């Protein structure tokens, strides 16, 4: 049911919600040929006979009391060079803004240079991707959605030299508690794990001439 920030409830039944959605969609439909009427749209939604909207669209469509996303989930990132500190912070800000509006967020960290890589600032070397996992995780815990924590998925390519540290960070109790994590495995890694052969990680992960490489035992990491 639609409610405002003071807790006032403006819908008393699922029918009220379906009429709100139908009226708003009909308002947009009216701008185009062969538009469906609000009643026709309502009949599609009623008792979820033919259409079952996602949770966020059910909340956001025609809602004059909240700024809510019209999609449940978003995959975000930065076009171009994305391993600068500014780009990393920009992703964090975008993540928070989406979560404030009920959006679940997923993004990949394979663009972040691995630990020990040279950087052009006073630190001289990169901290790697694990501290930024924690940053994004903490942002998720800080953003409440009507009492519910935001939803975050972080991923990394197995080809990234920090992928093992990425896995370990989630396994460490209390470290990355605001995110689910996923490692993207490729055929070369799985073949190396099966055959007991070494596997070469690199950064950038798609570079023909990578700036950094690291050889690992694929079967040991798999276990």
Language model features: what each stretch is:
Residues 1-223:
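Extended catalytic cores of very large enzyme megasubunits
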């Amino acid at each position: 049911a639609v409610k405002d920030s003071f807790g006032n409830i403006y819908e008393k039944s699922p029918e009220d919600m379906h009429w709100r959605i139908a009226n708003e969609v009909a308002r947009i439909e009216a701008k185009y040929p062969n538009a469906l009427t609000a009643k026709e749209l309502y009949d599609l939604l009623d008792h979820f006979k033919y259409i079952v909207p996602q949770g966020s669209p059910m909340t956001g469509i025609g809602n004059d009391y909240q700024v809510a996303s019209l999609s449940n989930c978003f995959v975000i990132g930065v076009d171009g060079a994305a391993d600068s500190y500014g780009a990393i912070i920009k992703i964090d800000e975008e993540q928070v803004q989406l979560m404030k509006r009920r959006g679940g967020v997923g993004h990949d960290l394979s663009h972040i240079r691995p630990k020990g890589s040279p950087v052009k600032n006073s630190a001289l070397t990169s901290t790697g991707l694990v501290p930024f996992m924690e940053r994004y995780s903490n942002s998720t815990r800080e953003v409440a959605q009507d009492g519910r924590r935001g939803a975050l998925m972080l991923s990394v390519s197995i080809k990234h030299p920090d992928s093992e540290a990425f896995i370990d960070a989630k396994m460490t109790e209390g470290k990355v508690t605001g995110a689910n994590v996923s490692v993207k495995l490729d055929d070369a890694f799985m073949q190396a794990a099966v055959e007991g052969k070494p596997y070469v990680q690199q950064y950038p992960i798609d570079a023909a001439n990578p700036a950094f490489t690291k050889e690992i035992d694929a079967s040991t990491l798999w276990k």
